[in-house]
């Protein structure tokens, strides 16, 4: 399979140039100056875990490069309401247009419809996108270690924290994890999907979890489909989850979430 991530990153560089030509960075910086406080993404995750509950980041995702359109009848506001009712701790909303058929408008619609903190799920490679996320109303951004140099990781995470945004730093292997723990953010995501091949195995999280510092929240991402998957993770003290496709294929995403994570309660 072709290297999807490199293709996406090349497009992101062009996208940033196009967007900054329309809305200059100086304007975004000015607009980010006096915004309300964010909803506290990391704090919400920590609170759910402290209460003994699974901390679920429920994803609002229409499509993906590997699966095509996942949810043809895609209503972000309705999905957000359903997720909140189903017990989600936070939301993740895809805003990448070209590869995931996402939209900035989807993030606004989802966030306005609920009280949950929201992650802007995109490929952040430039400070422009961090300011953009804050202005859009995001509470957290994603930084993918395999897409960034160490200096970029430090600069982008530092800028995000300066703007009041939380950061989820995503890794896929132990070398990336060693780089990620140098970034002083509380959320580390282990993606069970290899972003270069899009293949998935839960063993990725199990193999790496012991190397995640105890003061960080380990979020397992991708491949959580059954209650047995959830129980496997929780039996290994992995209590934070990012789940998208499983819910997006259900008629009622929030009910699917409740069944997967809370049906035993």
UniProtKB/Swiss-Prot annotation:
The keyword Lyase applies. SUPFAM superfamilies: Ribulose-phoshate binding barrel. Keywords: Amino-acid biosynthesis, Aromatic amino acid biosynthesis, Decarboxylase, Lyase, Tryptophan biosynthesis. GO terms for biological process: L-tryptophan biosynthetic process. Pathway: Amino-acid biosynthesis; L-tryptophan biosynthesis; L-tryptophan from chorismate: step 4/5. It is an enzyme of class 4 (lyase). One of its GO terms (molecular function) is phosphoribosylanthranilate isomerase activity. It catalyses: 1-(2-carboxyphenylamino)-1-deoxy-D-ribulose 5-phosphate + H(+) = (1S,2R)-1-C-(indol-3-yl)glycerol 3-phosphate + CO2 + H2O. Its EC number is 4.1.1.48. CDD domains: IGPS (cd00331). Gene3D superfamilies: Aldolase class I (3.20.20.70). Belongs to the TrpC family. This is Indole-3-glycerol phosphate synthase. It comes from Xanthomonas euvesicatoria pv. vesicatoria (strain 85-10) (Xanthomonas campestris pv. vesicatoria). The gene is trpC.
């Amino acid at each position: 399979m072709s290297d999807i991530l490199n293709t996406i990153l090349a497009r992101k560089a062009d996208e940033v140039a196009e967007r900054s030509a329309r809305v200059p960075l100086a304007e975004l910086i000015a607009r980010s100056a006096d915004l309300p406080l964010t909803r506290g993404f990391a704090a919400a995750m920590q609170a759910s875990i402290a209460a003994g509950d699974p901390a679920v980041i429920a994803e609002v995702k229409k499509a993906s490069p590997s699966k095509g359109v996942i949810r043809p009848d895609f209503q972000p506001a309705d999905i957000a309401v359903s997720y909140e009712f189903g017990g989600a701790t936070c939301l993740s909303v895809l805003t990448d247009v070209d590869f995931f058929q996402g939209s900035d408008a989807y993030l606004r619609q989802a966030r306005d419809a609920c009280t949950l903190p929201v992650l802007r799920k995109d490929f952040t490679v430039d400070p422009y996108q961090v300011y953009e996320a804050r202005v859009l109303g995001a509470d957290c951004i994603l930084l993918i270690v395999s897409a960034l140099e160490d200096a970029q990781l430090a600069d982008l995470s530092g800028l995000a924290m300066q703007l009041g945004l939380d950061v989820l730093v995503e890794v896929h292997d132990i070398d990336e994890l060693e780089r990620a723990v140098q970034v002083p953010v509380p959320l580390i995501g282990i993606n069970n999907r290899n972003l270069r091949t899009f293949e998935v195995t839960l063993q990725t999280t199990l193999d790496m979890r012991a190397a995640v510092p105890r003061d960080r929240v380990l979020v397992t991402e991708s491949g959580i489909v059954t209650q047995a998957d959830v129980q496997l993770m929780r039996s290994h003290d992995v209590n934070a989850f990012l789940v998208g496709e499983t819910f997006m294929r259900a008629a009622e995403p929030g009910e699917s979430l409740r069944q997967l994570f809370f049906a035993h309660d």
